[in-house]
Amino acid sequence: SDCLERRAQKSFPNALTVHRLDMDTSGLMVMGLNKFAHRHLSLQFQNRNVGKTYFAWVYGNLKKEEGMIDLPIICDWDNRPKQMVHFKNGKPSQTKWHVIKKNKNKTLVRLIPITGRTHQLRVHMNELGHPILGDRFYAHDQALNMSYRLCLHATEITVMQPIKKTKITFKAPVPF
């Protein structure tokens, strides 16, 4: 089957994926071009030493300009691959958010995940009552119909270069 890792391996035979994006999310992904780089980059993600920034259009206008969402998330086994907030058994999940721009019935937000749970940003924004536009799993009909695609984009990632030990930041412009 067609996947990013196989495409990268045509030019870089030892390339390995370090982390994933949800299938409908656009933006940056990190790959190690050899086993050494893959190991060091993977440890940075595991130890939460990677800076990640996403942009998203969400439904409605948030009342505050910024905030922190701290809600535990667990797999919704009856509705996989959906996730849900579950205070008893969920894994700790935190997301910082900041309003960038407000329009009539939508808001552009910067999202910074502190943890990296599956669908974390999507679940957290939905729990605030502001689902991400075009989200076929979590958005209500009105928010779903406001975009033909999921309006969630991994726009910036900062990692430590494994050999030089210097921070490097990669950026991808927002396509929506």
Residue ranges and their predicted role:
Residues S1-Q94, K101-K104, C151, P175-F176:
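RNA pseudouridine synthases
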Residues G67, L71, S93-T95, T107, ...:
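Short beta-strand segments
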Residues V99-K101, Q161:
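Short, low-complexity Ser/Thr-rich regulatory SLiMs
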Residues V109-I112:
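Short histidine-centered loop motifs in beta-beta connectors
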Residues Q120-F176:
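Pseudouridine synthases involved in rRNA/tRNA modification
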